Regions:
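Active-site entrance/lid segments in N-terminal catalytic domains of soluble metabolic enzymes
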Residues: 1-132
Length: 132
C-alpha cells in the first residue's frame, strides 16, 4: 500500500521530505498483486504519523528504505506530495497502473465531509481514471 511517506516506493527530496520514486515503485511493484493508495490515514488529523527513531529496527529501516542507522524519527506527512487534488490523484492512479503493468489499483480512505468523496467521484467520472 502507498501512504504519504511512500515507503517501498519513495525516497528523500533535497529538503528531507519523502517523495514518490517511479523507478523504485516500478521495481517493487513486481512483488505486489495489487496497489492500494491510502488517503486520510494520518495518525492525527492534519499532522500525519510519527515513528520514534528508538523503535526503528534494521528490518523496519530496510522495509521503509531509510538509511541505517536511523538518526531521526520517521515522519509520515499528513498529505501526499505526489498529488494535491482529485484530478492529480487520477493522474497518479494512471501512473501507478502503467508502472505496475496493469495491476489493480484500490484506495483506502476516511472522509470527514461527504463533499470530499463527491469531488473524488466527479474527477473519476470526468477523467475516466479511477481505482478498480
Amino acid at each position: 500500500n502507498i501512504g504519504t511517506a511512500y515507503f517501498g516506493c519513495g525516497g528523500f527530496a533535497s529538503d528531507g521530505s519523502r517523495v514518490f520514486d517511479p523507478d523504485l515503485f516500478e521495481e517493487n511493484s513486481q512483488y505486489a498483486k495489487m496497489i492500494e493508495i491510502k488517503l486520510s490515514q494520518g495518525a492525527k488529523p492534519g499532522h500525519g504519523g510519527l515513528l520514534p527513531k528508538e523503535k526503528i529496527t534494521k528490518e523496519i529501516a530496510d522495509a521503509r528504505n531509510l538509511p541505517w542507522p536511523v538518526l531521526h524519527d520517521c515522519v509520515s506527512p499528513a498529505r501526499h506530495s505526489a498529488f494535491s487534488n482529485p484530478y492529480e490523484l487520477c493522474e497518479f492512479i494512471n501512473t501507478l497502473r502503467t508502472l505496475s503493468k496493469g495491476k489493480p489499483i484500490g484506495m483506502k480512505l476516511c472522509m470527514g465531509h461527504p463533499e470530499e468523496f463527491a469531488a473524488l467521484v466527479r474527477a473519476f467520472v470526468e477523467t475516466g481514471e479511477a481505482p478498480d
